[in-house]
Amino acid sequence: MPIADRQTRISLLWLPAFVPLWLAGCGGYGGGGNGGGGGGSAPSAPTGLTATAANAQVNLTWNASAAATGYYVKRSTSSGTEVQIAAQSATAYNDNSVNNGTTYYYVVSAYNSYGQSANSAEVSGTPLAPPPPAADVTITIDPTKTKPISPYIYGTNFYSGNTAPQPNFTFDRAGGNRWTAYNWENNYSNAGGDYIYNNDLYLCNAGCNAAIPAEAVRTFIAADQSAGLASLVTFQLQGLVSADGNGPVSTANPPDMTRFKTVVDKKSTVSSVPFTTTPPTTDANVFMDEFAWALDQKLPGIFGANPTHPTFLSLDNEPDLWNATHLEVQGSTNISSTNFITKSVTLSEALKDQFPNLVIFGPVNYGFNGIYSWQGDPSLSPTPNGANWFADKYLAGIKTASAAYGKPVVDVYDFHWYSEATDGTTRVTNMTGSSLTDAQVQAIVQSPRSLWDTTFKENSWITNSVLGGPIYILGRLQAKIDAENPGMKIAITEYENGGFNHIAGTIAQADNLGIFGSLGIFAANFWPPGGTYSYTLAAFRAFRGFDGANANFGDISLQSTSSDVASVVVYASTDTTAPGRVVFVAINRSNAAKFTAINGQALSGTAHLYQMTAASASTQSVVQPVSMGPMAVSGSSLTITLPAYSVTTIDVH
């Protein structure tokens, strides 16, 4: 026989009895040798192995090996230590049991009935989450540009008289037409044109004893202090106050001096009688400095340097409309701007002689035309971009008087702002229902931009017929103050933007509050309309008590700019009482969800989200933020999808 056959036979004869015969002549299991028994062999090692990493998966492909009936897929997180994770016949494998950010190593071997091949060349893949989509809107925060946020911007008018559930207000104002002819000695006032020019005790309501002088004001301030609010009360500048409570006053030949008494700013100019908290009511005069003194006697320290809940004083109310609202005392000819400034200085000095630290608000313009032209004062010839508005004249007069007096005679430039924006037909303040058109919604939610935005032109008589362009009233006023009377503050003590029963009202009001804080406005008081306005009050809850308790927006504003201010704005703050805490209020005033990136402010910890939308509000009797749960944050960027027409508070700590 051939030599080779003899060698095979000898090998079989010497094989130990316990070794199975099928092993004889095998090339070794898994070693890639030649098979025996039938002349077959194990397949060769696979070639062309590739690994493609994706989000939470690694996809493998390789070339088929001749004679292979299947393949072993092997994996490890360190090179050269792979273990089998799958056996299959296909030449592709999707490994979806992986973690993003971890590198995985792979080899593949082929097998058939004769054995297993050697391993393929090793490959690796690192699955990663996909990058976030491009932001619809980018918000850029500059933490180096900051302003303190005044605690008095979260204000209202006649807090105690409001029956709706109130948010966490900080500031209350006793304002409105009623206070112009209020007589502190007897608590009578006149309604003016609001109600048949009626002399009555309207201001001395529940808990007020009209027989006690100044009780209408004392009870107002006391209630505010009990609620933790600062107060703004109105002092009488027009010149006449109600003598009685005997009903309507004739306007046929005003004023009827049998029904009114004369206001005197400084008692010592006409009388040597000392101040008293119980002045006679039979004389002809009512003294303003005595009024302030009496309030301090009743509520000691309210006009001090830094009381816990300060009381500020306002020099009357909307004097540029006295001939319309208070015909009974003013007549049909209004006070001139010159006389008004003179009277303001005289009253302010009389009050500050008594209380040097008193903070005084004026001129309390009713709106744009008062600021611009004193409602058509013939001594003024204002031009849109000129330094010849009533505001310029007022600031110059106050500056001159302050220099002579040795301190500011008016501390805060105060005006009212009932938005004049329209949808082309209807003014936003008249859009009060729960069903609004898209055009009406946009008119409301964009209207706050007229406070500051030099690129935004609302549709109103102001922009179309007077200025011929954007209003940006706060920017204009601040520039005039900086030029003429640096250091004077700004307040808006009555304002409305409509949408009281619609998410549009929530958005507009939240925007107002963000604007007030970011621009350093000193004080602001929302004017509650008649009827319901839960959606507007809800906006305060985005800044105050948004967690249903006492979590508030911070007290330092960070500069924020938006790549699409018509769609999304974000207001940013830090908290001096909690280092590292950052609070954002993000407003989407568009009708589509916006993926928003907020960049530039270092963040750490957890973001707690609270949100208001039309859908969430529709299920609530008291509209308020809904907790959306936590979100981990780090670095200096945060991304979030803001629902259409929504207000979202993001509290990072």
What are these regions (language model features)?
Residues 564-605, 609-612, 646-651:
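Carbohydrate-binding surface patches
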Residues 67-84:
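Extracellular low-complexity, O-glycosylation-prone stalks/linkers
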Residues 629-653:
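C-terminal beta-strand-rich structural cap/linker in extracellular carbohydrate-active enzymes
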